[in-house]
C-alpha cells in the first residue's frame, strides 16, 4: 500500500511519525514522508490529491492536514480524497482552547467518518468519538524504538524526572483559565489520588447551567465540545501538579532535567521548585541522551498529565525499553498491560515516597533488579512499532471492508 505521513516541528511528534514511516517501509509499503509546513492551503490540498495513495497518516493535532481552512469553515482533511488515519497521542483536543473551534472540528471529523480511522491512547476519547457518531475508533498504546538492556550496576543518578514542571498548584493563577477554580480542585484530587478520573467530574460540571453561562455563549451549544474545552484547560495544571508531587519528596535527592519552562530566562517562583534536595540539570538535547539518563537512573519518576484518565504515556515505555526503572502514578491501562504494575505504581504522595525509599535502598537490590528485568522482558516484544503498525493494519482492514458494503 501507499501512505503519506506528515512530519512535525515538535520533536516528540516527529520522532513518532518517523518511526511509523520507517516501520511501514520495513513492511514493504511505499511511504511519502512529507514536511507540509511550507504549503499554503490550496497547494497542500492539490498536491496531496495529486498523489496516488491509500492512506494519509496524521500523528498529532498540530499537523497541517488538521488545520482549519483559510478560505472557508472546513478543515483541510475534509478536502482530501484519500482515507485518513488519525493517531491520537494526546487527548483529542488538548491543543485547543476555543469551544467553537473544538465543536467545528468534531463536526468535521464526523463529516469524514466513513473514510477515516482513529487510534486513541485514551479510552474516553473513543467514547467521545462514538458519541459524535464516529464509529471507526480503536484503542492503541504507545511504542518505543529504544532497545537498550537493563544494566545491573550502580546507577549514576538517584531519583530523576525528565520533562517540564512548575513548582506548585497554589502558585498557579487558576483565575486565568475558564472554569479554573473547579479545574484546580480536580488537579488537587489527582495529586491526592492518582487514579482519580477527571472525565466524570468534567461531565457533571457541564450539566450546571451556571457554569456553562460563565464559559461563554458557545458552552451550551455542544456539551461534548465544552467537555473537551475544559479538559484542555485542566491540562494547564499538569505542570504545577507534577511540581506539587515532587515537592513532597524530602529525604532523597531529585534531579530534574529541563523542568523550567522558561529555560532560566524568567525569574518566577512558579517556574522553579526551590527545595534543597531538588537539583535542575540541563534539558536533554535528543532522545538518545534521554535514553542514557533513563538507563542510568535508580528511579525514573513518571507523572501523567491531567488530560488522561487511563492512558499510559510514552515516557513509561521509553524508560523500560531504555533498560531503566520507572515509578509512576497509577494508570488503569498499565494494569492491563503489565503484570508488575502494582509494584511500580503509587496512588498517593505517601506511597510514592515509601516506594522511593524502598527501591533506593540497596538492601532491596534483588527485588529491584528482578522487577527491572522482568518488566523489560514483558515490554520488549510487545510495545514495538512493528506491533503498533500490525495492530493498525489489522484494525483498518475489516473496517474498510464494512465501509465498502454500505
Which residues are covered by each model-predicted region?
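Catalytic binding pocket for nucleotide-activated donors in carbohydrate/polymer assembly enzymes
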Residues: 3-9, 15-27, 32-39, 111-112, ...
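Short N-terminal targeting/anchoring amphipathic segment
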Residues: 48-65
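Histidine-centered beta-alpha loop that forms part of the nucleotide-sugar donor binding/catalytic region
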Residues: 60-61, 88-92, 121-123, 141-144, ...
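Active-site proximal beta-strand in glycosyltransferases
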Residues: 77-92, 119-120, 158-160
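Membrane-proximal helix-turn-helix segments that form the acceptor-binding/catalytic region
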Residues: 100-117
Amino acid at each position: 500500500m501507499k501512505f503519506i505521513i506528515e512530519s512535525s516541528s515538535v520533536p516528540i511528534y516527529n520522532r513518532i511519525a518517523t518511526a511509523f514511516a520507517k516501520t511501514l517501509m520495513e513492511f514493504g509499503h511505499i511511504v511519502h514522508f512529507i514536511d507540509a509546513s511550507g504549503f499554503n492551503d490550496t497547494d497542500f490540498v492539490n498536491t496531496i490529491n495529486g498523489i496516488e495513495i491509500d492512506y494519509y497518516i496524521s500523528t498529532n493535532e498540530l499537523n497541517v492536514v488538521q488545520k482549519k481552512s483559510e478560505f472557508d469553515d472546513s478543515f483541510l482533511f475534509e478536502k482530501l480524497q484519500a482515507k485518513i488515519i488519525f493517531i491520537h497521542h494526546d487527548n483529542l483536543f488538548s491543543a485547543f482552547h476555543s469551544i467553537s473551534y473544538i465543536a467545528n472540528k468534531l463536526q468535521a471529523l464526523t463529516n469524514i467518518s466513513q473514510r477515516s480511522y482513529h487510534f486513541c491512547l485514551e479510552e474516553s476519547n473513543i467514547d467521545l468519538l462514538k458519541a459524535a457518531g464516529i464509529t471507526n475508533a480503536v484503542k492503541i498504546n504507545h511504542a518505543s524504538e529504544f532497545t537498550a538492556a537493563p544494566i545491573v550496576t550502580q546507577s549514576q543518578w538517584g531519583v530523576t524526572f525528565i520533562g517540564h514542571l512548575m513548582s506548585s498548584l497554589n502558585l498557579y493563577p487558576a483565575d486565568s483559565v475558564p472554569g479554573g477554580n473547579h479545574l484546580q480542585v480536580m488537579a488537587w484530587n489527582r495529586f491526592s489520588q492518582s487514579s482519580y478520573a477527571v472525565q466524570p467530574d468534567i461531565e457533571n460540571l457541564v450539566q450546571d447551567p451556571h457554569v456553562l453561562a460563565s464559559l461563554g455563549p458557545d458552552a451550551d451549544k455542544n456539551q461534548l465540545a465544552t467537555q473537551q474545552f475544559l479538559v484542555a484547560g485542566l491540562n494547564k495544571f499538569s505542570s504545577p501538579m507534577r511540581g506539587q508531587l515532587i515537592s513532597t519528596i524530602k529525604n532523597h535527592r531529585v534531579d530534574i532535567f529541563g523542568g523550567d519552562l522558561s529555560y532560566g530566562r524568567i525569574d518566577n517562583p512558579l517556574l522553579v521548585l526551590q527545595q534543597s534536595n531538588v537539583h535542575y540539570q540541563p534539558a536533554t538535547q535528543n532522545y538518545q541522551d534521554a535514553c542514557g539518563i533513563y538507563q542510568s537512573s535508580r528511579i525514573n519518576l513518571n507523572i501523567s498529565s491531567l488530560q488522561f484518565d487511563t492512558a499510559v504515556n510514552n515516557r513509561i515505555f521509553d524508560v523500560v525499553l531504555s533498560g531503566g526503572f520507572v515509578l509512576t502514578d497509577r494508570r488503569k491501562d498499565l494494569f492491563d498491560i503489565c503484570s508488575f504494575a502494582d509494584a511500580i505504581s503509587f496512588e498517593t504522595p505517601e506511597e510514592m515516597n515509601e516506594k522511593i525509599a524502598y527501591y533506593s535502598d540497596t538492601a532491596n537490590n534483588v527485588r529491584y533488579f528482578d522487577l527491572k528485568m522482568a518488566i523489560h522482558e514483558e515490554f520488549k516484544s510487545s510495545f514495538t512499532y512493528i506491533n503498533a503498525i500490525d495492530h493498525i493494519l489489522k484494525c483498518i482492514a475489516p473496517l474498510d471492508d464494512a465501509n465498502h458494503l454500505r
